[in-house]
Amino acid sequence: MTFQVELVSPEAITYSGEAEMVIARTLEGGDIAFQPGHVPFIGVLAVWSVEVIRPDGDRDVFAVHRGFVQVAGTKISVLSDVSEKSSEIDVERAQQAKDNAEQKLSQNDEDIEAVDALARAELRLQVAGV
């Protein structure tokens, strides 16, 4: 049994297709796995990965930078500020962003923007397999 999944950001639809399971991390409930027949749900996403397990067993992993997940009937929608498929992440750019954030934090460890930038860069690198 499958359901329809869409990952959408302001720039693009990064995934649209069938899936057997979606795994995400919410701010309120931690990691959660959605399968067909899941009760209706709306949650706030953390800066973390979203994993889509397709009917053929293959997995697609996305770096998601905050947003919302909604389960309604046979459809799951992930709406996020940024959604990047693992194979499309620019590793060099992510490493540079990480280095820049670490440099800013070495000068001011309370710089909230640098803390957020570091979390996003580390997520991109993790999802890209670095």
Where are these predicted regions, by residue range?
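Compact, glycine-rich, soluble single-domain proteins
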Residues: 6-95
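Acidic/glycine-rich phosphate/pyrophosphate-binding loops and surrounding catalytic core
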Residues: 83-130
